[in-house]
């Protein structure tokens, strides 16, 4: 799909560009988790280095946040196209689309970097077994040898910002679209 959108000039629209970014995220999700999981399955070695765990956590968190922000962008583009069709070209210029995508990647990377740096610098107990098939922040927090309630609060805040608010924004966007179609 990414190649098709890149090659066909008729598909050089904001929504198609956002769809290609979403496809890129899906490809990266697979390459973040599956290779290590497949290696563990084939070789029976279920360990990962501390650095490898940090890298996997960083990319997984980045992709999750970027996906949520891109879905908001897609909802916005859809809402503008349906509710304000005459303003679409003004509100959805190529520059605006590139800014939405770039902003999503930058915000996702900053959020993931903050969580990954913190999670890699807390003291861990001697037992470092994660009962999970990949490294992510909640699984690693359970291994900490310190009180992590403040950090867990920031994880909850981050999850609220990047999961609950996007869900509400997307729902409102669809509500606005349905209202416009109804009228």
Which residues does each PLM region occupy?
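Transmembrane helical core of 7TM receptor-like proteins
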Residues: 1-183
């Amino acid at each position: 799909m990414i190649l098709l959108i890149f090659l066909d000039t008729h598909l050089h629209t904001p929504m198609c560009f956002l769809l290609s970014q979403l496809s890129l995220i899906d490809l990266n999700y697979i390459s973040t988790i599956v290779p290590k999981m497949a290696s563990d399955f084939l070789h029976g070695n279920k360990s990962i280095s501390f650095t490898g765990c940090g890298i996997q956590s960083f990319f997984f968190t980045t992709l999750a946040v970027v996906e949520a922000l891109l879905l908001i962008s897609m909802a916005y583009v859809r809402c503008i196209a349906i509710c304000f069709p005459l303003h679409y070209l003004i509100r959805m210029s190529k520059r605006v689309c590139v800014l939405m995508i770039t902003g999503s990647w930058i915000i996702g990377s900053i959020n993931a970097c903050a969580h990954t740096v913190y999670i890699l610098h807390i003291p861990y107990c001697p037992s470092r077994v994660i009962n999970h098939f990949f490294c992510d922040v909640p699984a690693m927090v359970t291994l900490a040898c310190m009180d992590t309630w403040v950090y867990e609060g920031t994880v909850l805040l981050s999850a609220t910002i990047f999961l609950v608010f996007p869900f509400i924004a997307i729902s409102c966007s669809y509500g606005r679209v349905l209202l416009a179609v109804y009228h």
